[in-house]
């Protein structure tokens, strides 16, 4: 589940039009804003064409922007849950993440320092270790 994740209308418009700037802007905000990728941007390797941007990224951004039931859904979660946030995330700021975590019964929150929104790309080993620790 997720809480409300508003997306700037200009970013949605770029994605709907298949503009490659949509991917670049999303990654600038999502990946700690300044790091360079070894071997190139992984999202640009997945979303390669204007059609991909329209059919994958735009649909995802619109879904994030329009979803409004996160708080209600979170209150219904009734199993141990781990929420991992990046301290530098500009897409889901830390305060919003903590508020969302507080809605889930029996939840554990872990903050990965020096990490943005793309936790699995930025800090894969730390994330993996925290998930394994939680599952034990």
State where each predicted segment sits.
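Conserved alpha/beta-hydrolase catalytic His-Asp/Glu region
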Residues: 14-76
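Short alpha-helix in the alpha/beta-hydrolase fold that links the catalytic acid
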Residues: 79, 93-102
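Glycosyltransferase donor-binding loop in the core domain
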Residues: 15, 89-92, 116-119
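Short beta-strand/loop motif that positions the catalytic acidic residue
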Residues: 77, 83-85, 89
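Alpha-helical elements of Rossmann-like donor-binding domains used by nucleotide-donor carbohydrate transfer enzymes
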Residues: 10, 25, 44-45, 59-63, ...
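Flexible "cap/lid" loop of the alpha/beta hydrolase fold
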Residues: 1-20
């Amino acid at each position: 589940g997720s809480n409300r994740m508003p997306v700037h209308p200009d970013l949605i418009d770029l994605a709907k039009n298949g503009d490659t700037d949509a991917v670049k802007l999303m990654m600038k905000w999502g990946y700690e804003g300044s790091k360079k990728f070894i071997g190139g941007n992984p999202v640009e390797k997945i979303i390669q064409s204007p059609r991909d941007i329209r059919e994958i990224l735009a649909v995802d951004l619109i879904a994030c922007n329009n979803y409004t039931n996160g708080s209600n859904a979170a209150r219904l979660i009734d199993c141990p849950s781990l929420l991992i946030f990046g301290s530098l995330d500009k897409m889901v700021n830390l305060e919003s993440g903590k508020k969302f975590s507080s809605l889930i019964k029996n939840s554990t929150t872990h903050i990965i320092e020096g990490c943005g929104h793309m936790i699995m790309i930025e800090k894969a080993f730390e994330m993996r270790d925290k998930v394994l620790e939680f599952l034990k």
